[in-house]
From Swiss-Prot:
Keyword Membrane belongs to the record: yes
Composition-biased stretches (Basic residues): 1-10
Transmembrane segments: 21-43
Location of the region described as Disordered in the Swiss-Prot/TrEMBL record: 1-20
Localisation per UniProt entry: Membrane
Record keyword Transmembrane present: yes
Bilayer disposition of the protein: Single-pass membrane protein
Keyword annotations of the record: Membrane, Transmembrane, Transmembrane helix
Protein name: Uncharacterized protein YHR007C-A
Record GO cellular component, one term: membrane
Length: 71
């Protein structure tokens, strides 16, 4: 029961970290840097340039939150 609750919290945190990211940004950590850089132009236009840079920074330097999407 405790384990289930912990998994739920983890899932919620993961969702919060990728709020502004479309599914295209959720890559396995094993993907190479060029692969991560390739979809940058898919950033939604509602994001400002600064926000877009922040998201890219999170992708490149915090691979902990960049996980394959689990349905």
């Amino acid at each position: 029961m405790h384990r289930k609750k912990r998994k739920k919290e983890k899932k919620r945190t993961e969702k919060d970290n990728t709020t502004n990211l479309p599914p295209l940004f959720l890559f396995p950590c094993s993907l190479s840097l060029p692969t991560l850089l390739a979809p940058v132009h898919y950033i939604p236009t509602r994001l400002t340039h600064h926000q877009a840079e922040n998201q890219l920074f999170l992708l490149l330097f915090q691979p902990i939150i960049v996980k394959p999407l689990r349905s």
